[in-house]
Amino acid sequence: MQMNATRGYRPGLVDLASGQVSREIFVNDDIYAQEQERVFARSWLFIGHESQIPNPGDFFASRMGEESVILCRDRAGAVHVFLNSCRHRGMKVCRYDDGNTTVFTCPYHGWSYGTDGALVGVPFFREAYHSELDRTKYRLVEVAQLCCYKGTVWANWDASAPPFLEHLGEFRRFLDLILDGWDGREGQAELLGGVQKWIIPCNWKFPAENFSGDTYHNISHRSVDLVGAGPSGRSRRDYGELNVARKLHVAIPDRGHQTITYMLPKDHQPQAAYQNSPEVAEYFRHCEEERRRRPGANSRLIGAPGEIFPNVALLPRQPRTLAVWHPVSAHQTEVWRFFFVDRDAPRPVKNFLRDYYIRYSGPAGMTEQDDMENWNYAHSASRGVIARRHPYTYEMGMGHAVENYEWEGLRMPGRVVDLTKAQ
């Protein structure tokens, strides 16, 4: 795609042969504007979780790119996602984060919509509209496609886009590491608490790229490792288990998804963790044993940071989260982080994990604040005229990816780079 050269945008932004990527992609306002039309208006985006709307009339205000949307359950129990904008003059019809209602009423002129999107009330319908307004033409704008997968809700404005599971492809197994139970049972995850939200001064692609498989920034979190802020009380991560695994970068190029994952050997036995809390340690010991008894490739995988194109980050390990990088402008991103836990986990386990998630994540979290500082200063340092002349380098692993990677009988999809020696 090309743009007016006077607007500061040049062709040749990505050189696949040399691994050079122009900084313009991360700081250019015109590119950002095109992304809203060509990426966010056509992609599958994460909306929320069905546990946020368990009852008829429940709603949750979410986002799709720059658009405000409403996730709600109608009186018949069906799930909908609507554009949060009145068809009359465009005012938001819902200004609360969540709740329960029978109708969404626009505070501007009073048009009212049912939880199924139908226009059910128009002030002065007889007196001013002479009963001639066709209310069926002015339903709330609804997404073209909707998919509920293991409790998560995804939506797409593009009716011609492939179905969600086709969009996921073989990357589905990595999302399952979050949504399935720690013991391997399908779809056992539930949201823990509310949604953590904050704004960071950088382009949305900085965090998205970071979670797409950047394995080279552990130095940023060195201080956290020294503190021993991990769930076991010994380090930020349980390195003992990771040290016996194969560390892999997995990319599904035709869909844009990427992740880091760890592949355990066949004969691996669960290692002790959460030693400072015997009840929590016993729960996860039992779950690990059950998981390895169940058939399926995921019993040998340890999840790590990943990204579902375009803007949903995975973190299947503790903290077990999905994060959404909502674009606000070319230079600002709103982060929404959703935390997960097994729905039938004992209350002490949920409380323990809640405390750890808060300690780890968000603008006050001991780890994530390091990431935010990196993204903030990388963005601001890339906006100048001189800085834009010098591309970023993405040469790590170039020429060393393999298709159909296999180790001890377990195959990985997509293009895989073995990073075991780089741990």
Predicted regions and their residues:
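Generic structural signal for secondary-structure transition and capping sites
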Residues: F40-W44, M91, Y216
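C-terminal catalytic domain of Rieske-type non-heme iron oxygenases
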Residues: A144-Q423
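Non-catalytic accessory segments flanking enzyme active sites
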Residues: G19-I70
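Rieske [2Fe-2S] iron-sulfur-binding domain
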Residues: Q52-A159, P163-R173
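Short, contiguous pre-domain boundary segments
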Residues: G8-R23
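Short clusters of hydrophobic/aromatic residues that line enzyme substrate/ligand-binding pockets
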Residues: I47, V93, L119, A313, ...
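Short Pro/Gly-enriched beta-strand edge/turn motifs at strand-loop
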Residues: R42-P54, F124-H130, G303-F309
